[in-house]
Amino acid sequence: MTTMAETQTWQTVLGEEKQEPYFQEILDFVKKERKAGKIIYPPQKDIFNALKLTPYEAIKVVILGQDPYHGPNQAHGLAFSVRPGVPAPPSLQNIFKELHADLGVSIPSHGFLEKWAKQGVLLLNAALTVEAGKPQSHANIGWHRFTDKVIESLNDHPEGIVFLLWGSYAQKKSQLITNLRHRILKAPHPSPLSAARGFLGCRHFSKANQLLHEMGRGEIDWALDEKVS
């Protein structure tokens, strides 16, 4: 017997949204900006990596970011993650510090979080593109409408999901998460500006696994392998 989750995919829950005129306008805007010679991150092929790597039916945990990294070779479509060989930015360093303090896992030499994504951790930014060197430059081109729809579709997910909301921006999205089967954990943002105010010490990784266990869902192996392809 197939469950409701197994019959739903990103295509079934977002297919109609992608037909909306505003969605095509976003893609056209990004295309036009690239054509005009502007550097846009992440590369075109990586924009929807979060949805490609973490199937709707497999989602267990959601970590929300604001927008992609705006430096060279960093962003590749997963919130907080950077490509192999690129130094971990400060927020990600603090995530690793907390992971080490919480679960005792060693701090990796890279910041490539694909292993999390493939286990059911959706690493979703609210805006999916950004202009080089200009944080939040694409915050108002329509992405938020689309990613709010993503969150609303997760609220309807038939399995319990743990949402990790770090910082006031992510926490505002909790109003979209109304289904009582889900669990929400909140903490300050891991940025150096706020990490010491309660992100460090939040123990969200062990708490998420405990909640998944209570919901009868498999836990996440948060430890990252030293070798990445």
Swiss-Prot record:
The EC number(s) this enzyme carries: 3.2.2.27
GO molecular function: uracil DNA N-glycosylase activity
GO cellular component assignments: cytoplasm
Top EC class for this record: hydrolase
BP term (GO), one: base-excision repair, AP site formation via deaminated base removal
Family in the record: Belongs to the uracil-DNA glycosylase (UDG) superfamily. UNG family.
PANTHER family recorded: URACIL-DNA GLYCOSYLASE (PTHR11264:SF0)
Protein name: Uracil-DNA glycosylase
Species, as recorded: Coxiella burnetii (strain RSA 493 / Nine Mile phase I)
Highest classification ranks of the organism: Bacteria, Pseudomonadati, Pseudomonadota, Gammaproteobacteria, Legionellales
